[in-house]
UniProtKB/Swiss-Prot annotation:
It comes from Mus musculus (Mouse). It comes from the Eukaryota. This is Protein kinase C and casein kinase substrate in neurons protein 2. Residues 327-362, 384-396, 404-416 have a biased composition (Polar residues). Residues 426-486 form the SH3 domain. The modification N6-acetyllysine is found at residue 53. Transmembrane segments: none annotated. It is a peripheral membrane protein. A motif (NPF2) lies at residues 405-407. Residues 11-282 form the F-BAR domain. A motif (NPF1) lies at residues 362-364. A motif (NPF3) lies at residues 417-419. Residues 315-426 are annotated as: Disordered. Residues 25-274 form a coiled coil.
Length: 486
């Protein structure tokens, strides 16, 4: 009940009570909230599925990029395999996260969607059938009691008004006795007023008590009817709560990769791959394929022969090919076939270079003939090899010429500048960049569309020009990325 009327206590119950008229609406609203919570849970799982998909894509892209970098990079042997195993782990884990995404959307999401559709039925006029049924049930259960309560409130108000009038009449009579100007007739009227007020108080009190008694008589039935409708709402909510618990347990199983057998296998195999890395074996392989363990075609005495096609000198053999191919000599061993892609380097050449190669690789000619060989390094740049391949220098022949010595102090320290020589050929031309270009190697220029620079060498057969930025930096750039300034 909303108010308990007791002459001795007069305790007022909180107006927030469920039994107050209209306070059942919170229970009715819970039904609408259940429908909204189904939508919220679906949105929650949908966002998580998107995160799983994005993470899987990022893992795949990361693994692809780093696999290429490692395979083309300087790492070799069993440590290279261990490193690549980390990328394999990412690719396999990516597949598992895509499976998680599929499970969340195809199973959990759809399950909630179907349950929501079955549990809540929309009406033509708006709202849900379940909400209206609960609203009507509570209203019907509360209507008789609310009517009696209204009568009690009216009787209460009338009784309190009568009591107030009685108190006011008594106060006026007391004041009139102290006033000598009032005649007996006026005093008699005040006394009659008091008597009438007392009768009204008794009458309204009797009606008030009678109304309360009737209200008390209807209260048990009211409580029973309200409890019955409330329990129906509780049963409906219990189904939703149990369903949510069931779905969340399914979500937990789909998200928990630690219980997936293939997930454990991934990291067990990754650990085995890393532990299989053997530094001693890698060093032995490098010694056999790139170190003192390599075979050598030591110079031997060669008889002169009139058949030049069969007795070409080593110098003349190099002139007969269009390019110079440097290939590591395979040794007998377990890992003789594990040469990196950077082990073989193809260098295009031209007739002018052939002459210089001839002179620079002859160990018996004067050193004065090798002065121009350094500048030819730039003319044999191959743009389609990795940065690691470009930085490797393997001489095709022995020479005491420092320009062809891969172990000279300049090359060993990595400080040689291919543009230190005066490489300017032809007339310098001012050009303007048509597009943005970001240099991919240390000897390439970077610029933005609209930037101006100076072309100092014409386009080569690879489609590259040499230019100089206004900052003084000299390097290569694609010829079709610029136009001459008129």
């Amino acid at each position: 009940m909303s108010v308990t009327y007791d002459d001795s206590v007069g305790v007022e119950v909180s107006s927030d009570s469920f039994w107050e008229v209209g306070n059942y609406k919170r229970t009715v609203k819970r039904i609408d909230d259940g429908h909204r919570l189904c939508g919220d849970l679906m949105n929650c799982l949908h966002e998580r599925a998107r995160i799983e998909k994005a993470y899987a894509q990022q893992l795949t892209e990361w693994a692809r990029r780093w696999r290429q970098l490692v395979e083309k990079g300087p790492q070799y042997g069993t440590v290279e395999k261990a490193w690549i195993a980390v990328m394999s782990e990412a690719e396999r884990v990516s597949e598992l996260h895509l499976e998680v995404k599929a499970s969340l959307m195809n199973e959990d999401f759809e399950k909630i969607k179907n349950w929501q559709k079955e549990a809540f039925h929309k009406q033509m006029m708006g709202g849900f059938k379940e909400t209206k049924e609960a609203e009507d049930g509570f209203r019907k259960a509360q209507k008789p009691w609310a009517k009696k309560l209204k009568e009690v409130e009216a009787a209460k108000k009338a009784h309190h008004t009568a009591c107030k009038e009685e108190k006011l009449a008594i106060s006026r009579e007391a004041n009139s006795k102290a006033d000598p100007s009032l005649n007996p007739e006026q005093l008699k009227k005040l006394q009659d007023k008091i008597e009438k007020c007392k009768q009204d108080v008794l009458k309204t009190k009797d009606k008030y008590e009678k109304s309360l008694k009737e209200l008390d008589q209807t209260t048990p039935q009211y409580m029973e009817n309200m409890e019955q409708v409330f329990e129906q709402c509780q049963q409906f909510e219990e189904k939703r709560l149990r369903f949510f618990r069931e779905v969340l347990l399914e979500v937990q199983k789909h998200l928990d990769l630690s219980n997936v057998a293939s997930y454990k296998t991934i990291y067990r195999e990754l650990e085995q791959s890393i532990k299989a890395a053997d530094a001693v074996e890698d060093l032995r392989w490098f010694r056999a394929n790139h170190g003192p363990g390599m075979a050598m075609n030591w110079p031997q005495f060669e008889e002169w022969s009139a058949d030049l096609n069969r007795t070409l000198s080593r110098r003349e053999k190099k002139k007969a090919v269009d390019g110079v191919t440097l290939t590591g000599i395979n040794q007998t061993g377990d890992q003789s076939g594990q040469n990196k892609p950077g082990s073989n380097l193809s260098v295009p050449s031209n007739p002018a270079q052939s002459t210089q190669l001839q002179s620079s690789y002859n160990p018996f000619e004067d050193e004065d003939d090798t002065g121009s060989s350094i500048s030819e390094k730039e003319d044999i740049k191959a743009k389609n090899v990795s940065s690691y391949e470009k930085t490797q220098t393997y001489p095709t022949d022995w020479s005491d010429d420092e320009s062809n010595n891969p172990f000279s102090s300049t090359d060993a320290n990595g400080d040689s500048n291919p543009f230190d020589e005066d490489t300017t050929s032809g007339t310098e031309v001012r050009v303007r960049a048509l597009y943005d270009y970001e240099g991919q190697e240390h000897d390439e220029l970077s610029f933005k569309a609209g930037d101006e620079l100076t072309k100092i060498e014409d386009e080569d057969e690879q489609g590259w020009c040499k230019g100089r930025l206004d900052s003084g930096q000299v390097g290569l750039y694609p010829a079709n990325y610029v136009e001459a300034i008129q």
